[in-house]
């Protein structure tokens, strides 16, 4: 399964609580935190909701 790297690049201060909760659900707490998540539609939907706060990169599959 493909993986994606998500980095929080902008502080969620001043944004709505649902966006802050989405970041917490992704595992992002502080600016420049990085998490690796599976590339599935549910995660992509959460990324779309906070796309103005995060940077997303696809990771190469290792076999």
Swiss-Prot record:
It comes from the Bacteria. The keyword Ribosomal protein applies. One of its GO terms (biological process) is translation. GO terms for molecular function: structural constituent of ribosome. Transmembrane segments: none annotated. GO terms for cellular component: cytosolic large ribosomal subunit. InterPro entries: Ribo_uL30_ferredoxin-like_sf, Ribosomal_uL30_bac-type, Ribosomal_uL30_ferredoxin-like. Keywords: Ribonucleoprotein, Ribosomal protein. Coiled coil: none annotated. It holds the Pfam family Ribosomal_L30. NCBIfam families: rpmD_bact (TIGR01308). Belongs to the universal ribosomal protein uL30 family. PANTHER family: LARGE RIBOSOMAL SUBUNIT PROTEIN UL30M (PTHR15892:SF2), MITOCHONDRIAL RIBOSOMAL PROTEIN L30 (PTHR15892). Part of the 50S ribosomal subunit. This is Large ribosomal subunit protein uL30. The gene is rpmD.
């Amino acid at each position: 399964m493909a993986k994606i790297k998500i980095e929080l690049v902008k502080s969620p201060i001043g944004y709505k609580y649902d966006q802050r909760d989405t970041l917490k659900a992704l595992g992002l707490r502080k600016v420049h935190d990085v998490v690796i998540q599976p590339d599935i539609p549910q995660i992509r939907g959460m990324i779309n909701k906070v796309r103005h706060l995060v940077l997303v990169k696809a990771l190469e599959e290792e076999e």
